[in-house]
Amino acid sequence: ITSYCKPEAVVTTPSFLAFSAKKSSFVLFAKAVGEAGLNVAVYTNYAYLIGTPRAIGPYGVGRVKTVMGWHANIAGYPLEKYYLDYIEQYDEDWGFIPQKYAIDIFAAAIRKAGSANPTDVAYALEGFRYDGGVGEVWMRPDDHQLILPLYVATLRNTSEGLKYSADDTEYGWDTDVKIEAEQNILPHTCEMDRP
């Protein structure tokens, strides 16, 4: 006598998927979700990088959501002019705000320290506050973490009323929610050794 166990299959559809990988891995994942016909949000933290919206294409529209410090369709902020000037000068898209913050804050810390000595600059960075163009950005003194506002945005067709595209495509980012810098502060256990 052979006994067969036939468990009942339970098929569920998740309410969302989270994926943290850069470009090619994420693009393959997002396309697979689209091709499978899963109508779920796909959250990631790298979809805004140059080349990704173009590679994802229609598979990401209304589905891919990313966390970022800025995107071009945030109207009314000084970064819009910076964005347009960058495109005019370099003939390519720009969307990676941490680069701008790093350069601006580092230059300001050198000026504040009155020197390029790494120790002097490191101390000048501690507690440094800066208008990042979409809100205050600051360097937490305890662990040198950059605290800044974040946006959760969804990839949409520009025909849905978006002013700017991403990657010179027909797709752009549309804000779902802004998370203020104060809401991004998490406790830490860092104990930096200072010179």
Regions found by a protein language model. Give the residues of each.
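Solvent-exposed, acidic/polar segments of extracytosolic/periplasmic ligand-binding ectodomains
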Residues: 129, 133-195
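Short, well-structured alpha-helical segments that form the helix of a local strand-helix-strand
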Residues: 117-134
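Extracellular/periplasmic Venus flytrap/periplasmic-binding protein
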Residues: 1-37, 72-81
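Active-site lining segments that contact anionic ligands and/or coordinate catalytic metals
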Residues: 14, 39, 61, 134, ...
